Amino acid sequence: MKNPTPILLAIGVLTFTNCDTLKQTAGQMATDAINQQMGGGNTTSKPILSKDEAIKGLKEALLVGVNKGTDRLGAVGAFAKNPSYKIPLPPDVQAVEQKIRDNRILNKLIGGELDKVVDAMNTGAENSMKKAVPIFKKAVTEMSFQDAMGILTGGEGAATDYLRKTTESDLQGAFKPEVKKAMDGVSLTKIWNPVVTQINKNKRILGLDNDIQTDLNQYVTEKATTALFQEVEKEENNIRKDPVTRTTEILKKAFNYADQQRK
């Protein structure tokens, strides 16, 4: 019988060579898959969308929404004349408003003041919008690539939802002092305090168990922030739906890529 060693060695060499080849092939396939997920192809072709471009595109879309939203909401009558955004009396006051207006004495004392409170809240909210842009810009600075890609290829409002979930509490904290300044500018506190005093003084007549203790500044801040998020979402959805609204190269590149991924 011939010596089998050379044959076995040859088979061994081929086996190890094939294993190395398989490993290299698998590695290349993984690399190609990552490149494809990033929007690129092989190493010689330019990626369609880089990590930085994905994040910059989303940030720009959000900031476009903030800028346009604050412009719209900062206009005279933007809150007061828009049923979607008009800030009504706080719920605890709404609950007794009709009783106040039905009571001749109370209506004479504070009926007109209730209307002034509503006017002042809405005017103050409009005036606070000019201070919102830098606060929102700061909030948009941190966003991971994984978040960016998921949001970019997500559905309508995905970017705004992300911003709302991750920053709303901090945004309200930063925005609240600006809302207070705007409220002070329209003398809301001077109007509000006598109203609350009269309501609490007559709470038994009005059927109230407890005093009115609404933090009016917090109430208006929440309403103003909610309205701004809604405006940002409208603009984001416009950018997603209508290529004409993609007015910069980074917006075109990011959202054209998103369009391709959904096909």
Positions of predicted regions on the chain:
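Mid-length scaffold segments of soluble, non-membrane domains
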Residues: 107-182
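N-terminal Sec signal peptide cleavage junction
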Residues: 19-20
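An amphipathic alpha-helical core segment
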Residues: 178-223
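Bacterial N-terminal signal peptides
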Residues: 8-15
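A cross-kingdom marker for long, charged
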Residues: 24-33, 37, 217, 222-263
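Bacterial N-terminal signal peptides that target proteins for export
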Residues: 1-7
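N-terminal Sec/ER secretory leader and immediately downstream segment
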Residues: 28-120
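Extracytoplasmic
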Residues: 57, 82-84, 146, 223, ...
